[in-house]
Amino acid sequence: MTNHPKMTALAVEFFARFARFEHALKEIPEFRNGDEDGVKPNWDVFGQAAEIAALYSAIVAAPKAQYLVQNPPRKRIVRSGILEWKDMPKPQNTMEVLVAIRRVRNNLFHGDKGNPNLSRNVQLFEACIAILDMALAANNDVLLAYEINQDIS
């Protein structure tokens, strides 16, 4: 993926932590959607939980976390048949911050992080990790599922 050791380590750390976080959400009945065909984390319900919704002011005040709010990840689009990046508005609440974190994950997973040596990517990964940590600290049920059940086989 890259020759930049810090970028590689952060990308792997973010991706692994994001995966564990989604797994933890699925362990909590109120934070999952699913049936016999599959299960998905319900990020919207999680983001609406009072303790999570209240995190926005802490996110914008935290030096590492605020980078995501001030410099939101761009969205990959096709305009007139040409693949482009679309600038996205700054998140105005925790729900929108969670969408931005998922966009960073999608851009990474689908290979759209571009030049991996850009300090912007490093800062986005650091911000996402910081915010996920804040969300874990705010919800004991998700934290417990995150810490105890690490088997995501």
Where do the PLM segments sit?
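Amphipathic alpha-helical interface elements
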Residues: 1-100, 114-115, 121, 143-153
